Amino acid sequence: MAERVLANLEAKFTEGNYYDILQSYKALYNRFSTQKKYKETVTLLESGCNKFLEYKQWNCAADLAKLLIECYKNFKIQYSDESKEPIIKIFKNFKGECAGKISFMRDAIEWSSKNGGDSKGSEEFHTLLAITLSEEGDYIDAQKHFIFGNDYFSFCEMLKNWTEDVDEEEKDLYITRAIFGLLCLKKLKQASDLYNLFTTKVIKGDPSPLLNFDRFLLLTLERDALPLFNLLRQKYERSLKRDPQFKKFLDQIANIFYNVPIQSGGGLSGMLSNLLSGFGGGMGMGGNSSGGGLASMEVDGPTIEDEMD
């Protein structure tokens, strides 16, 4: 019966009355859900999504895609290779900008976080959403999802595009914020890989004091070296004051890697939001001189480097 119903629905697409077709899908969704017919419900929604996508009816497809996540929640479906496959397939088949597509993946991330996936949501889902947001020019939101994702190559490409029109002396702020976000999730290797890729692809000339701090920080966190961590913060205090959020994040990083107690605050999620919101403006807080007072590089002289060896 379900096959016949689907065939009848799909035959109506040539008529072009997409709103009525969508309502028919929703009515069947409600019927199958009430009858606890999980497989039939998923088949219905997958088929409907793919058919609407075929006819470039993005909003209709997004409506059914969101119902698929609702179905997963109602039937308490766990995150797995099998359950994530239709989500990924549907999401990748959207073309162009569509707010419903973004909302669909946000729902999928929330579902995965509560049903067997990573507590912050599926890294694969975060990455897919981050790439899409980046393509649409929403770099602030994209960065948040790249931090929770697992693709530092695409992350670096996004940062490269984001900083194309940024003054050279301001680019170190972008990579530092990204690195701090990753370190707050204890993603040391990914932070190191991103730093190396960014400084190779994007940075021209000698590294700034802040970039040198980033490099030494990443090396320090590979070992049990809290005194050196504190010394780095002291030596690079001037550069770190360029963004008032850096202190809070370094306190969090000290807690994560060295169990240093921190005062209770808005939690990691709130801290990440504050860090990322800084990209909206005020990038040049205090500037980053490539000469003058910091040109002597006394804050990143051989004393620090020797301690790294």
UniProtKB/Swiss-Prot annotation:
Signal peptide: none annotated. Transmembrane segments: none annotated. GO terms for cellular component: cytosol. Residues 290-309 are annotated as: Disordered. GO terms for biological process: protein insertion into ER membrane. Belongs to the GET4 family. May play a role in insertion of tail-anchored proteins into the endoplasmic reticulum membrane. This is Golgi to ER traffic protein 4 homolog. It comes from Dictyostelium discoideum.
